[in-house]
């Protein structure tokens, strides 16, 4: 039996209120419903629609199994979310090299979480999406997206989640009036190494709008 590792780290937080009427349905559906109606699109769907067949096949090939990227990502995201919520967590000890360095990342010290895996929506585009975290550090409000890689060497080569962060920035502005995000960051966790990549707000917005434009022209008019 693989050993389990227990973590606890309570935060005192003042969280943003969830968006009224917005619900997320996870695996296997991965869909959002807003005020009783299903949203036709998700951020993931928009960004993945023009993924090259070779890359899509590679992702599918390495997705499944106890050491696949889905199991790894789910486990590490769960610990990260529970940590920010101030809840204890238990995880398979094989993920400790990722988790230990992630939770020791200097950026994540002395922060105040505002939202953790809290769904957002753009009601005009009818798209739902969920940032991993929105938090305060110093005078800045961050939107953070967590990515995991299988090997330590992959941390440095992993790109920032530019269009994804741009989507969350847009959604947060419409869902949480008066909350002005000033920093966008991709947190990349590997075994024994963690790296943060910052994105310019304007570039992230442009990347998201470009992705949405390519996607939306292929969709039927309702």
At which residue positions do the language-model features occur?
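Mg2+/Mn2+-dependent nuclease catalytic core
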Residues: 114, 118-222
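Metal-dependent nuclease catalytic cores that hydrolyze phosphodiester bonds in DNA/RNA
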Residues: 1-128
């Amino acid at each position: 039996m693989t050993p389990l590792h227990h973590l606890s780290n309570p935060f005192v937080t003042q969280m943003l209120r969830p968006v009224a009427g917005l619900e997320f349905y996870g695996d296997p559906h991965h869909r959002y419903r807003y005020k009783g109606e299903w949203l036709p699109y998700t951020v993931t769907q928009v960004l993945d629609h023009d993924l090259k067949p070779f890359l899509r096949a590679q992702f599918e090939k390495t997705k499944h199994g106890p050491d696949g990227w889905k199991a790894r990502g789910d486990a590490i995201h769960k610990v990260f979310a529970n940590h920010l919520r101030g809840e204890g967590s238990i995880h398979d000890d094989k993920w400790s090299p990722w988790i230990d360095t992630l939770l020791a990342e200097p950026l994540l010290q002395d922060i105040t979480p505002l939202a953790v895996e809290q769904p957002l929506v753009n009601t005009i585009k009818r798209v739902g999406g969920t940032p991993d975290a929105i938090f305060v550090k110093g005078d800045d409000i961050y939107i953070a997206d967590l990515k995991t890689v299988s090997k330590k060497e992959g941390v440095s080569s992993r790109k920032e989640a530019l269009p994804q962060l741009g989507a969350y920035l847009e959604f947060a502005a419409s869902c949480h009036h008066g909350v002005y995000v000033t920093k966008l960051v991709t947190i990349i966790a590997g075994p024994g190494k963690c790296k943060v990549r910052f994105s310019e707000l304007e570039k992230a917005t442009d990347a998201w709008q470009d992705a949405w434009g390519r996607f939306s022209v292929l969709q039927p008019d309702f």
